[in-house]
Each structure stands twice: as C-alpha cells, then as structure tokens.
Amino acid sequence: MLLEPIITSLLETDMYKFSMGQCIYHQFSDYKTTWSFKCRNTDVHFTHEMVEEIKEQIKAYCGLRFTEEELEYLHKIKWMKGSYVDFLRLWQPRYEDYEITEDAECGLTIETFGTWLNTSLYEIPTLAIVNEVYFRMAYDYDDLLASFEKKLDEKITLLKNSTYNLGLFSEFGLRRRLSAGAQELAVKKLNENKYPGSTFVGTSNVFLAKKYGITPVGTMAHEWIMCVGQGNHKHNPAYSNWYALDWWVKEYGILNGTALTDAITTDCFLRDFQLTYATLFSGVRHDSGDPFEWGEKMIRHSESLGIDPKTKTLLFSDSLDFERADKIASYFAGRVKIAFGIGTYISNDTDVPALNIVMKTTKCNGMDVAKISDTPGKGMCKNPEYVEYLQRCISWRMENDR
C-alpha cells in the first residue's frame, strides 16, 4: 500500500447507511444485491498502479471493526435499536464480496456481491477510497489541497458577509471528497464559524459528526426504494414507493422522516405519498429535476391534502453550490421549511474537475432493479429491457390508477 489508510473507522460512512441498515437488518436480512461502480467522466483513466492501490485500501478497510466507543455513540441516537447495534458489534466488511478488475473503459471495474445488509455498507467507503487514490496519484496533492483551502475560505467569507443566505445546510460530500483531511477541514471550519443568514447543521459523515459533536444527517437513499419495491418479484414495481414508505414507517414511526421522491419519478411518488405518509414524514428530499418546479409541486401536494406546507421541510441535495442554494432559499422563503445537503462543492472544489463517480444497486435477489429519476441519464441499470418494463409499469399506473 503506497498511501496511508484512507478509511480509518467504520463510522466513516453516510448516516443513511445506518438508518437503512437497521431496516434491512430487521426486515430484509435475506435479500441479496449486486452493486456496480461507474465513472461518468469520459476523460478519466485509472492506471494499473491506481487500481492496485484501490485494492490494497479496500483490503485495509475490510480489516476494520467497530469499537465499543463507536457503538455506544450509535446506541445514543434516538432511533437506533440495541439489536442493530449488537449486529454491528459482530459485523465486518468482506473483501471476498468484491470483484475488482481493469476491464472498464475508464480502467476500473468494481462490483460487490452479497447480502444487502453487507453490500449496502460498502458503497460510501469504496467511493471515498477510489476518489482519494485517484487525486493523490494523478496530481500534485499538495497543490490540490492548497487550492481547496483557498476556495473553502472564500466560500466561508461569502456566508459570513451574507452574500449567500442558505438557512439550514449540511455537508454531504464524503463519497466524492478530495481526501479525508480535506473533508474534515471543511467540516471543522464551517462548524466553527457563524453566519448571519446561514446555519451549519451537520454532516452525513458519522465519524466527523461524532468527532465534532454535530448532527449526523441522513435518512434514505434510492437503494431503499429500489430494493424494497423491486426486490420482491411479486410486487408491481410502479408501487415501489408505497412498499418502501410502508416498511420505513413500520420501523421508525414518525422518526427519520425525510422521504426521497425521485426513485421512479416524483409524479409516481406522489400517488403513494397521500395523507397518512405526508403527515407522518417531516419532509421530502429533492435529488433530480428542476428544484423550483419540484418545490412548487410539493407545496401544492401538501395543500391538496390540507397540510400546511410551512410545517414540512424540503431538503435539496442535487448538485448544489452556495449560489444555487441561496436562490432556492430566497425563492421559497416564508412558504415552506428549507434545508440543503451540499456535497462535492464543499468537499472537493479545487483547480481540477471533480470525479463524477457512483456505485449503484444493479440487481436485487437475482433480478434487475432500476431508478427512473426526474433527470434523464441518472439511472444505471444494465438491462435496457428491464428499464423499458419499469417505465411501462409506471406509465400504465399513471394513466389508469385513479
């Protein structure tokens, strides 16, 4: 291993991996999933040396275990149950679940195979490893870090002088961060400063949330809706949201209540997000499509159900920077609660372009699963026939299910 270990704690993942993980443990522990890595940058190539370093870093990650101090921290989270904490006490990543080759056009193929309970937890650390190895080995890292620090200080100044007023915002950048050190620096500086029109709430990185005594932020991801709704082959996949919301409420009741809307289009989501769920959930998250149109749609939906939109939160997390977040916050001011999850712009803004890398669920229980979001091209299913089938199911429901 050429570099120091990149992942040094099993807490170094996004919070929603634990909230989903607890549901998976209690309700879907026998589900099997396949996850596939993709680099969307067309001009990026991973060298043989990079791939070998990625393998060694993942092996080091697979040697980690939760400490009792970390487990105690998790157990104090109000929705975390002792049975899941006891499972995590025994849990360890398995390198045997990984298949890493150089077959892809970008020079790096990664797939993981195993229980959903295990493979779900691999996604975020794997992406963080790939990202940091690439930037440390492809560029002069010290120069990148210097440009990162300069841009970070400029961003903080823009918040302090009220050029941008975001209201509530959190850092969501673990998976595509420049490095562990860069992300920690960003979280530390954002947390220690005060802003007239913005409040830094926390981070999705549970390790950093614990270290700095701030809120670990996150509820559910697309994988939850895709696997719960499409992993049982007796289900009509156009009702994926209903199944996912139903099982979530069975686990958490009114806790952990931010629903993701765009796994199989927001319009289809709203067919299932009726009075019971719209009342129980504290808000919804935007991750694709036009944020202004989406926000208006959410407000109209709440009003149609007799719910005051001002009692609900719209969480925006799609490709945000401070300027875009400021415009959204200003547009919806006084009409609904607003919050932001901001990722790469905080954790990897340097003088070179960031990587656009993802790792997505591509199979569940031996069958294809897919996301059809509000932005074309964000899905990653390997079987176009399944995507066509899913789209037909959604279209039929939207046209016929009144």
Language-model region placement:
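Ordered alpha/beta subdomains of enzyme catalytic regions
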Residues: 1-238, 358-402
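Glycine-rich phosphate/ribose-binding loops and adjacent secondary-structure elements
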Residues: 2-3, 212-402
